[in-house]
């Protein structure tokens, strides 16, 4: 158990080009931990995390253009990736084989997110729609219409009740998943929403924007509960720790910040990347953070528990 924040491991030259996305999952089967990364080099890579180091397990080929988003199912068995080639691909993490490819066209799928029960994958489109695909069927099963602009980011609430989307014009929409109804439209940002994340108890929504701010919303009442500044540029990624106590952000200012949820204060800043940091996530226990970005490196940090 670590008592302070520190960098634990660096994987330099992890990809041939910028890394835009990373996910950290744990297999329900054997407890093994996997990190999946996606890059502008068109590749998805699967890394095993054990003995405090990363080992490349699979290099997954299939996308024709850069990979913009990856996500891992709740049971740690499947990864989803989306690419500028407008396809979503599902991969078996045990064998490294492609399970299926879904055409998310006509132009693009940006963020991909598994539903909490891992039966569905949601993705945002340039037309302001959230398209929801069945993992089993591989077909589009529902669509939620924001009547807005290109959706860059989406997140499911862990309790399965809500889906939030963030658009290129800074507008955030929260939907009731059961009814498909639009519940709230949040207009706190004026620039693209790169990332959003619900707290583990589904009470808070944290948003990251090119305006340099992180905002915290009370989901039920759609109230703005906090505005955090500290990054010197675009905020590209936000993620909650599994125990609700902290969340982490990354920015094009090359830094990663860890925030205390209750005090809304920054408790640690990492300046280890050489370029903008596109993706940051906690591991399933909240003891580690993974980050990746334009410098093609994957970093693992230790968090005090």
UniProtKB/Swiss-Prot annotation:
<feature type="repeat" description="WD 1">
    <location>
        <begin position="14"/>
        <end position="57"/>
    </location>
</feature>
<keyword id="KW-0539">Nucleus</keyword>
<comment type="function">
    <text>Component of the PAF1 complex (PAF1C) which has multiple functions during transcription by RNA polymerase II and is implicated in regulation of development and maintenance of embryonic stem cell pluripotency. PAF1C associates with RNA polymerase II through interaction with POLR2A CTD non-phosphorylated and 'Ser-2'- and 'Ser-5'-phosphorylated forms and is involved in transcriptional elongation, acting both independently and synergistically with TCEA1 and in cooperation with the DSIF complex and HTATSF1.</text>
</comment>
<keyword id="KW-0853">WD repeat</keyword>
<dbReference type="InterPro" id="IPR036322">
    <property type="entry name" value="WD40_repeat_dom_sf"/>
</dbReference>
<dbReference type="InterPro" id="IPR001680">
    <property type="entry name" value="WD40_rpt"/>
</dbReference>
<dbReference type="GO" id="GO:0016593">
    <property type="term" value="C:Cdc73/Paf1 complex"/>
</dbReference>
<feature type="repeat" description="WD 5">
    <location>
        <begin position="188"/>
        <end position="227"/>
    </location>
</feature>
<dbReference type="InterPro" id="IPR019775">
    <property type="entry name" value="WD40_repeat_CS"/>
</dbReference>
<dbReference type="InterPro" id="IPR015943">
    <property type="entry name" value="WD40/YVTN_repeat-like_dom_sf"/>
</dbReference>
<dbReference type="Pfam" id="PF00400">
    <property type="entry name" value="WD40"/>
</dbReference>
<feature type="repeat" description="WD 2">
    <location>
        <begin position="62"/>
        <end position="101"/>
    </location>
</feature>
<dbReference type="InterPro" id="IPR051510">
    <property type="entry name" value="SKI8"/>
</dbReference>
<dbReference type="GO" id="GO:0072344">
    <property type="term" value="P:rescue of stalled ribosome"/>
</dbReference>
<feature type="repeat" description="WD 3">
    <location>
        <begin position="104"/>
        <end position="143"/>
    </location>
</feature>
<dbReference type="GO" id="GO:0005737">
    <property type="term" value="C:cytoplasm"/>
</dbReference>
<keyword id="KW-0677">Repeat</keyword>
<feature type="repeat" description="WD 7">
    <location>
        <begin position="272"/>
        <end position="305"/>
    </location>
</feature>
<dbReference type="InterPro" id="IPR020472">
    <property type="entry name" value="G-protein_beta_WD-40_rep"/>
</dbReference>
<dbReference type="GO" id="GO:0005634">
    <property type="term" value="C:nucleus"/>
</dbReference>
<dbReference type="GO" id="GO:0000791">
    <property type="term" value="C:euchromatin"/>
</dbReference>
<feature type="repeat" description="WD 6">
    <location>
        <begin position="230"/>
        <end position="269"/>
    </location>
</feature>
<comment type="subunit">
    <text>Component of the PAF1 complex. Component of the SKI complex.</text>
</comment>
<feature type="repeat" description="WD 4">
    <location>
        <begin position="146"/>
        <end position="187"/>
    </location>
</feature>
<dbReference type="GO" id="GO:0070478">
    <property type="term" value="P:nuclear-transcribed mRNA catabolic process, 3'-5' exonucleolytic nonsense-mediated decay"/>
</dbReference>
<protein>
    <recommendedName>
        <fullName>Superkiller complex protein 8</fullName>
    </recommendedName>
</protein>
<dbReference type="GO" id="GO:0006368">
    <property type="term" value="P:transcription elongation by RNA polymerase II"/>
</dbReference>
<keyword id="KW-0963">Cytoplasm</keyword>
<dbReference type="GO" id="GO:0055087">
    <property type="term" value="C:Ski complex"/>
</dbReference>
<comment type="similarity">
    <text>Belongs to the SKI8 family.</text>
</comment>
